[in-house]
């Protein structure tokens, strides 16, 4: 247990007054770990001068009685003390032992209450700051928040940015800054009847939330930016896990057609449809910016470039089109495929497209130039991954192929599936490829191994085709048309959890935070799972038309928002995109 504010010190350490204990009004986190206000006017940066300096320690405890009791000291006790002083150290210890043995428990408890505080030292203030930091480096973020409540000295040390960097706060910097999307822009796009969002924040509370959203950067951010990032990321994760959903909106478009593809980049959402168009939406305003018209067939695949300047689309009209995100203008029409363009992947300005014509093509989207054609598959190319150098493709010919994008040469053909390959995942740093097939299996490959030995794991358990996969470390999560989500350890080749709850094919998968996965399904629901525990956290969206044709076609997300493409193939549910907000401000 960390020392609290009732700690008493001798002359060699801080008194309770020196400690300046943090009051209830000062606390940033209460005992339940929830945020509270802090308003002591602390400095915006760490100041070593504010820390109490180290002082020499006393070797004797000051246990003298109060003045009033000194006047009434029993002469017999004075005589006993005089005798005690003449004893050697060993004899004094023997005397203590005998006295304790002869004492009753009431006296022993009183003696303990007098002695114990002298052993509760404020060690952080006595140590050099560097040693104090080294100790705090071993604590969790939650423990550091508790440390900050002990005293102002401890608070100053615990807010040094280097300590919070050791917790990996750098990864939290990818969270976009808080937005104003629920301060009014989403009010006119209310969720329609027939859609249930459990735990949605109540309208009366939403006004308070809107006010808080205007205060994007709080006092802690000014004082300790990395601590503030940690607290914000923790709040965002709690918003996903359990807190009421802070805001929601509906983007209506594409009439009664199917939304076939969807991507998010910063504040831009792009949807493609079998109505031959794409729509570019401003998320924060909740409105369409452009409708991209030009394809003469349904749009089946699209991408937003990493720089955010280009939107690329592939269609059943056999063309690839490059559009400007800035003004929605058509920049290039890339021709060459002789059948539907079914899949694509981008790295920088280089695009790779896969087609039912059995080929892949490599393009430069900035210039519109065709760079290479990759021949080798004997049936339609269904999925592709690209890291800027290596292309990985999966086809209806049951194979996975590895290509050099610069030379157009096939480096390796991975065989083992006995039906069509529908999904791929490629982690270039470890040369790992995961492939999902209509043969119900998932294979994990290391294409740097000798030919014929590339398959390092065969994951079996699903009973239909795998529609999506995500990998972190050795943990792979897969969603399948059999209505189940499975969590795998690819190193061991075993299924860790099977997540059951959907009543129809799972259409999409998104991984959030440390251990949360969201899945959408043809049953009209979006579910959030804890893959570490193998348990359902909660339903995020439920369509009343689910089970009668209403479905969630796909998901895409940022760390603070989820977009759900909704509709039906029998007109039981209007086509739309539902946006859910899980954002939090910097405290």
From Swiss-Prot:
Composition bias, Basic and acidic residues: 1-11
Description of the deletion phenotype: Worms show a weak masculinization phenotype. Moreover sel-10 mutants suppress the egg laying defective (egl) phenotype of the sel-12 mutants. RNAi-mediated knockdown results in increased zyg-1 expression at centrosomes.
Segments annotated as WD repeats: 253-291, 294-333, 336-373, 376-415, 416-455, 461-498, 501-539
InterPro entries the UniProt entry points to: F-box-like_dom_sf, F-box_dom, G-protein_beta_WD-40_rep, WD40/YVTN_repeat-like_dom_sf, WD40_repeat_CS, WD40_repeat_dom_sf, WD40_rpt
Pfam families, alphabetized: F-box-like (PF12937), WD40 (PF00400)
Result for mutant: residue 567 to E: In n1074; masculinizing phenotype. Does not self-interact in vitro or bind to skr-1 protein
Cellular compartment(s): Cell projection, Axon; Cytoplasm
Designated name of the protein: F-box/WD repeat-containing protein sel-10
Species for this entry: Caenorhabditis elegans
Domain F-box: 121-167
Job description of the protein: Probable substrate recognition component of SCF (SKP1-CUL-F-box protein) E3 ubiquitin-protein ligase complex, which mediates the ubiquitination and subsequent proteasomal degradation of target proteins. Regulates synapse elimination in early development in the motor neuron HSNL. Cell autonomous negative regulator of lin-12/Notch-mediated signaling, with respect to lin-12 activity in cell fate decisions and tumorigenesis. May target the intracellular domains of lin-12/Notch proteins for ubiquitin-dependent degradation. Involved in sex determination by promoting female development.
Acidic residues composition bias: residue spans: 17-34
CDD domains assigned: WD40
Tissue: Expressed in tail and head neurons.
Primary residence: other
Compositional bias of kind Low complexity: 35-47
Matching SUPFAM superfamilies: F-box domain, WD40 repeat-like
MF GO annotations: protein homodimerization activity; protein kinase binding
GO annotation (BP), single: cell differentiation
GO cellular component, one term: cytoplasm
PANTHER family attached to this UniProt entry: PHOSPHOLIPASE A-2-ACTIVATING PROTEIN
């Amino acid at each position: 247990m960390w020392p609290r504010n009732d700690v008493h010190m001798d002359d060699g350490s801080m008194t309770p007054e020196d400690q300046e204990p943090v009051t209830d009004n000062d606390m940033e986190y209460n005992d339940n770990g929830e945020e509270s206000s802090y308003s002591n006017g602390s400095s915006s940066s760490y100041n070593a001068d504010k820390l109490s300096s180290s002082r020499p320690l006393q070797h004797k405890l000051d246990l003298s009685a109060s003045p009033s009791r000194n006047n009434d000291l029993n002469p017999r006790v004075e005589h006993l003390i005089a005798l005690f002083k003449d004893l050697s150290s060993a004899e004094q210890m023997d005397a203590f032992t005998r006295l304790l043995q002869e004492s009753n428990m009431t006296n022993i408890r009183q003696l303990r209450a007098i002695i114990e505080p002298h052993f509760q030292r404020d060690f952080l203030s006595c140590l050099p700051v560097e040693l104090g930091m080294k100790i705090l480096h071993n604590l969790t973020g939650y423990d550091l928040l508790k440390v900050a409540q002990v005293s102002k000295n401890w608070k100053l040390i615990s807010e040094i940015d280097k300590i919070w960097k050791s917790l990996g706060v750098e990864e939290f910097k990818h969270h976009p800054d808080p937005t104003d999307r629920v301060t009014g822009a989403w009010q006119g796009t209310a969720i329609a009847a027939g859609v249930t969002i459990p735990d949605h924040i109540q309208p009366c509370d939403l006004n308070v939330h809107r006010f808080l959203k205007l205060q994007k950067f709080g006092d802690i951010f000014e004082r300790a930016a990395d601590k503030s990032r940690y607290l914000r990321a923790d709040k965002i994760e709690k918003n996903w896990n359990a807190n009421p959903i802070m805001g929601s909106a509906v983007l209506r478009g594409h009439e009664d057609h199917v939304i076939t593809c969807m991507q998010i980049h910063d504040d831009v959402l792009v949807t493609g449809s079998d109505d031959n168009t794409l729509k570019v939406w401003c998320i924060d305003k909740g409105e369409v910016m452009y409708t991209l018209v030009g394809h003469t067939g349904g749009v089946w695949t699209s991408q937003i470039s990493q720089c955010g300047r280009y939107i690329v689309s592939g269609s059943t009209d056999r063309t690839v089109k490059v559009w400007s995100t800035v003004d929605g203008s058509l920049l290039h029409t890339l021709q060459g495929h002789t059948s539907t363009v079914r899949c694509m992947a981008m790295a920088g300005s280089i695009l790779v497209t896969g087609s039912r014509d059995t080929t892949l093509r490599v393009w430069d989207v900035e210039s519109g130039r065709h760079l290479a054609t990759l021949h080798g598959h004997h049936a339609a190319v269904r999925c592709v991954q690209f890291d800027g150098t290596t292309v990985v493709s999966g086809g209806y010919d049951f194979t996975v192929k590895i290509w050099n994008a610069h030379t157009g040469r096939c480096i390796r053909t991975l065989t083992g599936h006995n039906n069509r390959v529908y999904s791929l995942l490629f982690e270039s740093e470890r040369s790992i490829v995961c492939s999902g097939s209509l043969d119900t299996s998932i294979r994990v490959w290391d294409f740097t191994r000798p030919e014929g030995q590339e398959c390092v794991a065969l994951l079996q358990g699903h009973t239909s085709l795998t529609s999506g996969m995500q990998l972190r470390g050795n943990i792979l999560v897969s969603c399948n048309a059999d209505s189940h989500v499975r969590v795998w350890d690819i190193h061991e080749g075993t299924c860790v959890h099977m997540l059951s709850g959907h009543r129809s094919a799972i259409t999409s998968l998104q991984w959030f935070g440390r251990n949360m996965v969201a899945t959408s399904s043809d049953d009209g629901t979006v579910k959030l799972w804890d893959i570490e525990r193998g348990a359902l956290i909660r339903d995020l969206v439920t369509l009343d038309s689910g089970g009668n044709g209403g479905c969630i076609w796909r998901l895409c997300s940022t760390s603070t928002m989820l977009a759900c493409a909704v509709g039906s193939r029998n007109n039981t549910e209007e086509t739309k995109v539902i946006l859910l907000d899980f954002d939090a401000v910097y405290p």
